[in-house]
């Protein structure tokens, strides 16, 4: 179990990343504390955010600096990979828009753009709802963007995952916003029937999300 003081430090560092202008007293971080922070960051998938805050507002113990340097390189690599996936997803959304496919983006990037440094909040995939009538046209757009159906997935499944072997982008294409097999899924989906005609476009990086 991670000690309470390290858990509190973890939360303080997240606050510092989210609000860089907030004043915070310098914190001394030992190798043991750094190990605890690494574990929590990996568990909650916020490693780049914590590393960013550590670099801005922490005083590392001399014997923790080497470990932090390795951790920082890993975090910056994750940010670079996420930035590449984000750009690929923006290009995909623009291509879907150009093909007049009414895709509805939800979760994923729409939440990450709320962060001050969105690509520091890494995401394993993105989610899109595309009406079944546009399956064939959408598949052509995905393929033109270098994406292919993930191994084991069926193009006609309720959720189909497309992957790009070059950028690492993974996109889950949903045929409904809520799983039909779930108890309340059908009822919830009825509330959002025709949502592709009522979607609100969020302009980001030249693409409509």
Regions found by a protein language model. Give the residues of each.
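Conserved NTP-donor binding/palm subdomain of two-metal-ion nucleotidyltransferases/polymerases, i.e.
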Residues: 1-124, 130-209
């Amino acid at each position: 179990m991670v000690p309470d003081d390290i858990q509190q430090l973890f939360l303080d560092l997240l606050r510092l990343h989210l609000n860089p202008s907030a004043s915070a007293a310098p914190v001394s971080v030992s190798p043991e504390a750094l190990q605890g922070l690494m574990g929590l960051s990996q568990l909650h998938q916020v490693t780049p955010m914590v590393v960013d805050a550590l670099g801005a507002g922490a005083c590392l113990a001399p014997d923790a600096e080497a470990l932090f340097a390795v951790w920082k390189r890993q975090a910056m690599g994750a940010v670079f990979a996420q930035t590449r996936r984000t750009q690929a997803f923006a290009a995909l959304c623009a291509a879907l828009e150009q093909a007049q496919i009414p895709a509805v983006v939800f979760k994923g990037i729409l939440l990450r753009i709320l962060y001050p440094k969105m690509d520091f909040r890494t995401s394993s995939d993105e989610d899109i709802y595309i009406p079944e009538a546009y399956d064939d046209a959408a598949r052509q757009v995905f393929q033109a963007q270098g994406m292919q159906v993930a191994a084991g997935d069926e193009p006609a499944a309720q959720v189909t995952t497309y992957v790009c072997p070059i950028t690492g982008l993974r996109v889950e294409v949903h045929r409904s916003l809520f799983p039909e097999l779930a108890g309340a899924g059908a009822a919830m989906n009825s509330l959002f029937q025709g949502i592709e005609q009522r979607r609100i476009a969020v302009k980001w990086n030249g693409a409509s999300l």
